């Protein structure tokens, strides 16, 4: 039968819908793929870690913005893990856009697109963390032993490899509005600041329970801490 999957159909079919508790999608999201293919899609992400609030919780926010229409998808993933830190929040923020791009390429609108043509497209993702950028731009390299946050880095690399288009991570300076008015900043800088604010707001709102952890391959939620999370990641 023909593929009749819409963007929302795919997102709502993913397991562990609690992961998507904060996700705002303008006009159903079916504009995402045309925006990418026309070169009008801007993507940015940023993480948050507040050890004074919790030493284990972190969050990662992301915005996908169409420059032609102004339509957006905004989201935030929250995680509570013994491995929680700022880097984990940054990695979480990078996984959201990759999952949503996968959703866009899984819709009926993508069925008739020549895959060889799609492979010629390159989508930029802007991030202020150089570790995320380095791993995101090297999706086929293996990780060194004892690599911090290896579980999420493996997911970042895996999701990148499986996308039909090319992904390029680009550095954007964080907190650019410290010395420059917001309205004078570039679009990636503005999106980065908005992601930073969103990640902090949802981090404070969420306050995840101690012992909960999330893995986003599938998607599954586990409640047995870092060891259970690592075991499931190794099964990927």
Where are these regions (language model features)?
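RNase H-like nuclease fold core
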Residues: 11-12, 17-116, 136-137, 189, ...
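Charged boundary/loop elements
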Residues: 1-38, 201, 205-236
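Ordered, helix-dominated protein-protein interaction surfaces in large eukaryotic regulatory proteins
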Residues: 158, 197-200
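Intrinsically disordered, low-complexity regions enriched in small/polar residues
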Residues: 9-12, 24, 51, 64-67, ...
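Low-complexity, flexible helical/coil segments
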Residues: 77-81, 160-164, 204-209
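RNase H catalytic domain
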Residues: 49-52, 94-193, 211-215, 219-227
């Amino acid at each position: 039968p023909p593929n009749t999957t819409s963007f929302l159909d795919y997102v709502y079919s993913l397991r562990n819908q609690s992961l998507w508790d904060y996700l705002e999608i303008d006009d159903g999201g079916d504009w995402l793929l045309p925006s990418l293919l026309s070169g009008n899609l801007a993507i940015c992400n940023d993480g948050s870690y507040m050890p004074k609030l919790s030493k284990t919780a972190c969050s990662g926010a992301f915005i996908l913005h169409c420059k032609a229409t102004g339509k957006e998808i905004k989201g935030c993933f929250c995680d509570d893990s013994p491995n929680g830190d700022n880097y984990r929040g940054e990695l979480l923020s990078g996984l959201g856009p990759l999952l949503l791009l996968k959703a866009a390429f899984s819709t009926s609108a993508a069925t008739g697109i020549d895959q060889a043509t799609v492979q010629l497209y390159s989508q930029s993702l802007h991030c202020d963390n150089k570790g995320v950028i380095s791993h995101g731009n090297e999706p086929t390299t293996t990780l060194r032993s004892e690599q911090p946050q290896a579980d999420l880095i493996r997911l970042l690399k895996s999701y990148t490899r499986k996308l039909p288009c090319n992904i390029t991570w680009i550095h954007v300076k964080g907190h650019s509005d410290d010395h420059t008015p917001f309205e004078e900043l570039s679009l990636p800088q503005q999106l980065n600041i908005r992601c930073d604010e969103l990640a902090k707001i949802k981090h404070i709102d969420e306050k995840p329970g101690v012992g909960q952890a999330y893995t986003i391959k599938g998607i599954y939620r586990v409640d047995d801490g870092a060891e259970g999370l690592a075991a499931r990641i190794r099964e990927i």
